[in-house]
């Protein structure tokens, strides 16, 4: 319904709960932990109070040792383990406060014996597959093995849903390279990540993850508390505006709002503000110059083609880079170089069309299936024209693969001026000119030539000069550097 009312197609991502640890139930729904007091934490099922409460993790007694920390409710409450006796973990309250049912529990810097997927994750994943959703945001991914467990279910159901691995703990950060190889993208989920690792490490980790995702050509989302104050206030803090801008400058593909739009007082204003910050950052901060010399650590033929296409587009000031793609991989490769030219992904797949919504700078169009390279390129250009993404006379860079319909074979670059070639000849000026053609046989009867007109005649003489001065360009059949047209052009 939202798509129809807005006239825009969107991609949809489902977020899994992941293998979380939470507090159990309390006698009065809550309790207050006093700083300096002792409280016992146990995996046993019981109604908790200020002296003892339960958590939903059976192996907590074996995974912890004296000196370890337990953080509750996004780190608002901190406990220090003093001793462990059977199923009872004795702790000292370092930071007290109110604790209640089902609050999140974090065990910083610990490798936990949690499953990759819980039953609810599997049910949610199957729901997303049935409804043909585009991505699954997999929570608390710790290693490539976790990604493969999710992939196994997706492939079992014959789905092509993309996996976005949420990096939310120290294990995920440590194993980011193998996660990036196996996932379709990553999310820097800074909420839980900022509890699991020291807050001062989060900015550095964010930059490293974004850089590694950029190098491999996988989309990366930066999320959590980006405009947190706008849950309550109509304007963000200056620090939040800088945070959004810096994520963009780091190279993130997407910036994500969560609580601001899900539960905040100003959801629409939050979106508008984030959009304004993003556009201003890319326009004013040397964003494209910063990325134009980006060199990946490992070159492949498709990657080299993408790099060359971006350099060509910059040198020729092309209006667009059109990538004919069946899987979307070529468009992702082009995107990572952050070209100034528009990136158009022409694909026959509606699934790929939607999934590319997440990739920086890519606008997708649906084309027909084609068996030949020329037909595929023509279809891509014509569809882009019909969608209003390019115009006749625009110079575009086109990438494609031969043979057609084979993924990962991008090996062709073509430079083309959009439009049907009626005549060709030699030009004296630079750049591309488009306008309304005015065919003139008699200058005295031509009437007024307007600034957007292109004057066309067999030849010119002194009587044509007033018309030529007003015209945007002129074309004559009688050529040569010593012709009247050429001499007049050089003198203007």
Where are these regions (language model features)?
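Non-catalytic helical/linker scaffolds that mediate oligomerization, partner binding
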Residues: 1-492
């Amino acid at each position: 319904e939202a798509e129809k009312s807005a006239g825009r197609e969107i991609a949809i991502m489902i977020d899994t709960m992941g293998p979380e640890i939470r507090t159990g139930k309390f006698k009065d729904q809550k309790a207050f932990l006093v700083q300096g007091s002792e409280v016992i934490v146990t995996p046993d099922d019981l109604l908790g109070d200020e002296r003892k409460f339960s958590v939903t993790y059976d192996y907590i007694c074996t995974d912890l040792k004296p000196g370890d920390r337990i953080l509750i409710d996004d780190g608002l409450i901190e406990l220090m383990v003093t001793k462990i006796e059977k199923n009872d973990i004795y702790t000292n309250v370092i930071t007290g406060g109110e604790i209640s049912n089902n609050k999140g529990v974090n065990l910083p810097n610990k490798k936990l014996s949690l499953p990759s997927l819980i039953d609810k994750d599997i049910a949610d994943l199957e729901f997303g597959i049935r409804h043909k959703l585009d991505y699954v945001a997999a929570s608390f991914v710790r290693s490539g093995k976790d990604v493969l467990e999710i992939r196994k279910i997706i492939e079992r159901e014959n789905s092509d849903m993309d996996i976005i691995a949420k990096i939310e703990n120290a294990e995920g950060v440590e194993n980011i390279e193998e996660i990036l190889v196996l996932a379709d993208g990553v999310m820097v989920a800074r909420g839980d990540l900022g509890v699991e690792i020291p807050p001062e490490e989060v900015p550095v980790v964010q930059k490293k993850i974004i850089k590694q995702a950029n190098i491999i050509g996988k989309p990366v989302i930066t999320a959590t508390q980006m405009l947190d104050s706008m849950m309550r206030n109509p304007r963000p803090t200056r620090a939040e505006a800088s945070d959004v801008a810096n994520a963009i400058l780091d190279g993130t593909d997407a910036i994500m709002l969560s609580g601001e739009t899900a539960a905040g007082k100003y959801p629409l204003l939050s979106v508008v503000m984030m959009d304004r910050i993003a556009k201003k950052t890319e326009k004013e901060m040397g964003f494209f110059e910063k990325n134009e010399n980006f060199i990946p650590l490992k070159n492949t033929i498709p990657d080299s083609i993408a790099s060359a296409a971006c350099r060509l587009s910059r040198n020729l000031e092309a209006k667009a880079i059109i990538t004919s793609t069946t899987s979307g991989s070529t468009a992702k490769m082009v995107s990572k170089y952050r070209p100034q030219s528009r990136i158009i992904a022409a694909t026959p797949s509606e699934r790929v069309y939607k999934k590319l919504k997440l990739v920086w700078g890519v606008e997708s169009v649906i084309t027909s299936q084609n068996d030949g390279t020329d037909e595929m390129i023509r279809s891509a250009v014509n569809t882009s024209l019909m969608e209003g993404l390019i115009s006749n006379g625009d110079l575009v860079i086109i990438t494609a693969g031969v043979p057609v319909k084979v993924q990962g074979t991008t090996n062709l670059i073509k430079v083309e001026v959009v439009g049907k070639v009626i005549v060709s000849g030699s030009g004296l000026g630079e750049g591309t000119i488009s306008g309304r053609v005015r065919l003139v046989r008699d200058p005295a009867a031509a009437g007024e030539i307007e600034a957007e007109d292109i004057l066309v005649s067999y030849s010119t003489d002194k009587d044509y000069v007033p018309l030529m001065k007003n015209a945007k360009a002129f074309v004559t059949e009688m050529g040569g550097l010593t012709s009247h047209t050429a001499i007049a052009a050089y003198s203007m």
